[in-house]
Amino acid sequence: MQKLFNNSFENWIFDLDNTIYDIKAGLFVKISERITQYIMEVLSFTKEEANLVRSNMYKKYGLTLTGLMREYEIDPDEYLDFIHDVAHPELQYEKQLKLSLNNLSGKKFIYTNASQDHAEKILSAMGIEAEFEKILDIKATHYVPKPDPKSYEIMLKSFGILSNQVERSIFIEDTAKNLKPAKLLGLKTVWMENERNLEDYKDNAEYIDYKYSDLKSFLNDISKNNWIVGKSVGFKYN
């Protein structure tokens, strides 16, 4: 893993859940509980059966939704509306985060396996929705999820990232296996370190350029090392 970051970027691509907000906030725990609840209610499974189905679908398809669509023919819109129907009082206006994002050179995007509606609610709650050029959600990728390589091809096209701009683009994500396709395409990659994803990290460490405990730490490193638009400034990761 590289220890010196000395590029400025034209495109900053951010995952949403557990990346834009800290995994410690606990919001995704509530979403996870809703996923299990949905499977229990719609497929008439016990909690244990539902969790087993979740695990199997995630391992096989990379996203629980994809597996449920293919093997159980569930309605994806109904599913997304159900699992994202959670309150998020833990998310508040983040003035410093907004300033840090605003100070980044280049364009900023959200690339998520969740829905656009969910993404907009999260960004709005944190007061940072205006910092992003575009959101690419699971519906816009025709339900082809990360880490499917086809999803990344759709992402590059959707964000208008040309082949000669890929190496000037960076992807920040908490799910380590989702960084591999981005790295293979030529993007720089940043992993938001978390215990939930350690096994994936071990399997995909070679595809990760930098790792940080949270987004604020990553952006603070850029700020304190005097990031200047149009110039290359080096900084070390934590």
Model-derived segments and spans:
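N-terminal helical cap/lid subdomain that shapes the substrate entry/recognition surface
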Residues: 3-96, 117
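Hydrophobic residues in well-ordered beta-strands that form the structural core
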Residues: 22, 110-112, 191
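Substrate-recognition element of Asp-dependent hydrolases with the DxDx(T/V) motif
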Residues: 78-89, 97-126, 132-138
